[in-house]
Regions:
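Bacterial signal peptide processing site
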Residues: 20-22
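Serine endopeptidase catalytic core focused on the charge-relay Asp
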Residues: 154-156, 161-162, 170-231, 256-259, ...
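Active-site region of chymotrypsin-like
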Residues: 106-123, 187-194, 218-303
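Catalytic-histidine neighborhood of serine endopeptidases
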Residues: 127, 134-178, 204, 279
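N-terminal activation segment of mature serine protease catalytic domains
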Residues: 25-132, 299-303
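C-terminal motif of bacterial Sec signal peptides marking the signal peptidase cleavage site
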Residues: 16-18
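Sec-dependent signal peptide recognition
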Residues: 2-10
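Short, surface-exposed secondary-structure boundary micro-motifs
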Residues: 144, 213-214, 268
Length: 303
């Protein structure tokens, strides 16, 4: 018996960089690694999510969203399709952890479905993660984030940036259940949003940073390395094992290298028990699984 827990995350950041070779859109440069970027306005996570939920309710009341069943039909039509989205493949200058945090926070999103519960008349919002891959409102997240939830009255799908701007998901551009990824179009109302550039390949042992919203802790960043590339026993697809911490709410979150390039996307965890697959032996290890950028690149186009 496999104990796989899938999670959802979301992030966004604040900082301008230029690139060392190409200057990518929204990626400005800083050569000063000693520069300190202070968090001027720490977030109150529950208030942030509550405010986002109110904005979602308003969009639904004004019928400014795409119904979830329409998105599901689109998803089925886009299984294993290339999104045809032209992504940035430039290489920004290396950054330290402080700079990466601000950079990631501007480019990460809280992604979640809106739903009605059976205890009150209010809209609720599931918390997951995603990230921007094109400035015109194209984002990436996990397939399981946009799956139909059994027994839930789901109305729509929404993405929220770190400033609290809420964008309805209006179209599914590509989806892969086996690779647990989805590429979506959101309506930004004409607003340009900063995107993450894509690396060509994931490098074993390299330092990485991850951002997400585990357990409702919005825009939480963790650090680790890529520990392994492997073929999953569960689905036969290529995955990477990472040592960055994450939990429920971080699914779909971006994983970047020290240049701020996407090298993977959060997907799942697998608990390993002392007594084989029996919980009686106690948890001995938790493997963190991510989708490598070499897989993500199959669903986009590089410029």
């Amino acid at each position: 018996m496999k104990h796989i827990l899938k999670f959802t995350f979301f992030f966004v950041t604040l900082f301008l960089f230029s690139c060392s070779n190409n200057s990518g859109k929204g990626n400005s440069v800083t050569n000063n690694l000693s520069e300190q970027l202070l968090e001027q306005h720490p977030q109150h996570s529950s208030k942030f999510i509550s405010d986002a939920t109110k904005k979602v309710q308003q969009l639904i009341n004004e019928n400014k969203y795409t119904p979830f069943d329409v998105l599901q039909s689109q998803k089925l039509d886009k299984i294993e399709e290339n999104s045809e989205v032209l992504v940035d493949v430039s290489t920004p200058n290396k950054m330290n952890g402080n700079q990466i945090y601000s950079y990631l926070k501007e480019r990460t999103l809280l992604v979640g479905t809106s739903y009605l519960c059976n205890r009150c008349p209010n809209i609720h919002l599931n918390n997951a993660s995603g990230f921007v891959i094109h400035e015109d409102g194209v984002i990436a997240t996990n397939y399981h984030v946009i799956e139909v939830k059994e027994g839930m009255n789901v109305s729509g799908l929404f993405a929220t940036d770190h400033e609290g701007n809420v964008f309805p998901v209006v179209k599914v551009l590509a989806a892969s259940q086996s690779n647990d990824l989805a590429i979506l179009q959101v309506d930004t109302g004409g607003k340009k949003i900063k995107a993450l550039p894509f690396a060509e390949e994931e490098l074993m042992g390299s330092d990485i940073y991850l951002m997400g919203n585990p357990f409702g802790n919005t825009f939480l960043m963790t650090k680790g390395i890529i520990g392994r590339k492997f073929i999953s026993e569960r689905d036969g697809e290529l995955k990477i094992a990472v040592t960055t911490e994450f939990g429920p709410g971080a699914s779909g979150g971006p994983i970047v290298n020290t240049n701020g390039q996407i090298i993977g996307m959060v997907s799942a965890i697998e608990m390993k028990f002392a007594n084989n697959h029996s919980r009686q032996g106690g948890v001995q290890m938790i493997l963190k699984e991510a989708i490598p950028v070499s897989v993500l690149n199959k669903y986009v186009k590089g410029n």
